[in-house]
Structure formats: structure tokens, C-alpha cells
Amino acid sequence: MWLQLLLLLLAPQGGHGCHGLELDRELVLAKVRALFLDALGPPPVTGEGGDPGVRRLHRRHAVGGFMRRGSEPEDQDVSQAILFPAAGASCGDEPDAGEAEEGLFTYVFQPSQHTRSRQVTSAQLWFHTGLDRQETAAANSSEPLLGLLVLTSGGPMPVPMSLGQAPPRWAVLHLATSAFPLLTHPVLALLLRCPLCSCSTRPEATPFLVAHTRAKPPSGGERARRSTPPLPWPWSPAALRLLQRPPEEPAAHADCHRAALNISFQELGWDRWIVHPPSFIFYYCHGGCGLSPPQDLPLPVPGVPPTPVQPLSLVPGAQPCCAALPGTMRPLHVRTTSDGGYSFKYEMVPNLLTQHCACI
């Protein structure tokens, strides 16, 4: 009696078995809800509708800062990055009046790893000139108003660009395609020449760089691997028998095994409470504990009675049950918010994911 009670206490709560052949999804979800509420407590309620706020955490936990939606094709994986200068020209730090009259402005940009790892499709530099349209037209009639250089190890080099439409007192410099590789460097130092422009320290006049990127196409080797047709099935008597075998009966998967179910927190109604991960694979034990012999045992010999195979049982005389082996459960780490996304908390749900199942 005491041994049976000890077994029940040691059996993990997340790996309950002894279910029939068909396990209802709602039953699994109800069990998962109970496990989460037991570990984390009830979700916070701050609004009338029971939601902890409307601010959501952007799904940017992938490498590079962005996560692509699984339903979007690869050619639709586009993004836009706005870069502000890490160090710009300061009107109070200019060495002499000659440089100020020359109208040379230096801006240093630091593209992120995400931007450098992608293919740039367009790039524009927005610069506040402080000139109205008439002054801009008069300056362009005599000589180019703006010039763009990049600082390299060999000295300043011109950057091919063209002027586009811009709001009043602003200029938009569209970088040519040949200049897109500049955004793949960790540091980008641009020299902008504008003799008629005045230096401004106002925050709203800060220049910025806009880059549109998309995922790089696969390399030649990877493309070749994707386009290579699969090898034909090698013919053999065993392969022929495998192809000609009848379909398996549902009872073939009725034995004790580890089952999996993809559960999203939106389905549980907790997507505004548990913000990461958005979903997880829930493993649990399922199936019966019949007396079918293992596949590695020898076939029965005619005239010799077969030896009955008993499942593993920790309690003699007890009915075996498909359950997780004690001590083999793994936790799930989640990120939660109680104020709508203004602060986050890392929490853990222990003994949730089943690793090994057995009839015990």
C-alpha cells in the first residue's frame, strides 16, 4: 500500500497516461491550463475585459532582432531600418570658420547586424538644409547644391546619388545601387557638402538614413541543393514489400508512446500575458499498456508455448499505466507581462514536458 502511494506521488503531473486510444484536445488543453496556473498563478487582470493592457511585445527574439512570420514567403521578408548618426557635426566643435564656411558635415552611422546581413533594395539620406524652395532652385541652377562623400581607408570617395522630392527645407539623397554595399560595413562615415546650408543643433533637424532590405537569396551551393531532385528509391525486395504492405491499423499506434501537441498561448487566451514564446510543443504520454511483445524478440517456435511478456511495473499486482518516467520531465521557460508590455518577467513552469514514457 505504501509503495503504491509513493508511486503516485512520484508520477509527474504533466505526463499522465492511462487514456484511451483517442485523447480529446480539450482535455489536454485543460490539463495544460491547470499546470500553468499551478506554477505561475492566475493571469493579471487590469482592465474591464480581463486583459492586462493593450501594449504588445514585438516578436523580435530571433537572431538579428527580427522574426519572420512563418506564413510569409521568403521573397516577402522585407524590412525598413532608420539609422540616426552616432556622431555628427557639432556646430560648437568646428575648428575654424573656414571649415564652417565650406559647409562640410560629417555623420557616422552604425548599421545593425540585421541590416548588414540582408540585401539592401533602396537607401535614402534625409538632410535638413534649412533652405526654402526658391533658394534651393537658385543654388541648383549654378552648381549642385549637395555633394556626398564616404570616408574610406584611401580617403574620401564620392558616393553616387540623386536628389528626390522632399519636404520644405529638407533634401532627400537617393543612393545609387552601387552604393548599397556601404551599408554592409559596421561603421559608415559620410561627408555631406552643402555650402549654403547652416549647421543646426535642433533635434528635429537631425539627419537620418532610411534603408529598405530583404532577405538575401540562397547561395549557389544551397540553391543547388534545393534544386537537386531527390535520389530514386533504391529497388530491393525489402523495399518492394514495404511499398506493397497494407495500410496500418489505428491499433498499431495504440501502444504506450510519447505524443506531441502544438499549443499556442493565443488558443489558451493568454497571449497578452505570456508573450514569449508564442507557442510550444507539449509532449505527453499516451496509449495503452497491452501485452504485445517487443519487436526485437525472436518469433515463436512451433510447439513451444510463448513466454508472456509483462510490462514494467513498480508495484506487483497493479495495473500498468502509460506515464512519464519519474525524474525525466523538463521545464518550460516563458516571458510574462502584467502591465501590457511595459515590463517583463522570466518565469518557469516545472515538470511540463515529457521526455520518456513507459508502462509503470
From Swiss-Prot:
GO terms for molecular function: cytokine activity; growth factor activity; hormone activity. Proteolytic processing yields a number of bioactive forms, consisting either solely of the mature alpha chain, of the most N-terminal propeptide linked through a disulfide bond to the mature alpha chain, or of the entire proprotein. GO terms for biological process: hemoglobin biosynthetic process; regulation of cell cycle; regulation of cell population proliferation. Its main location: secreted. Gene3D superfamilies: Cystine-knot cytokines. Disulfide bonds join C256-C322, C285-C357, C289-C359. The record marks R60, H61, R226, S227 as: Cleavage. It is found in: Secreted. It holds the Pfam family TGF_beta. Keywords: Cleavage on pair of basic residues, Disulfide bond, Glycoprotein, Growth factor, Hormone, Secreted, Signal. Glycans are attached at N140, N262. SMART domains: TGFB. Coiled coil: none annotated. GO terms for cellular component: extracellular space; inhibin A complex; inhibin-betaglycan-ActRII complex. Residues 18-60, 61-226 form a propeptide. Residues 1-17 form the signal peptide. Belongs to the TGF-beta family. Dimeric, linked by one or more disulfide bonds. Activin B is a dimer of alpha and beta-B. Inhibin A is a dimer of alpha and beta-A. Inhibin B is a dimer of alpha and beta-B. Interacts with TGFBR3L; this interaction regulates female fertility. Inhibins and activins inhibit and activate, respectively, the secretion of follitropin by the pituitary gland. Inhibins/activins are involved in regulating a number of diverse functions such as hypothalamic and pituitary hormone secretion, gonadal hormone secretion, germ cell development and maturation, erythroid differentiation, insulin secretion, nerve cell survival, embryonic axial development or bone growth, depending on their subunit composition. Inhibins appear to oppose the functions of activins. Inhibin A is a dimer of alpha/INHA and beta-A/INHBA that functions as a feedback regulator in the hypothalamic-pituitary-gonadal (HPG) axis. Inhibits the secretion of FSH from the anterior pituitary gland by acting on pituitary gonadotrope cells. Antagonizes activin A by binding to the proteoglycan, betaglycan, and forming a stable complex with and, thereby, sequestering type II activin receptors while excluding type I receptor. This is Inhibin alpha chain. It comes from Bos taurus.
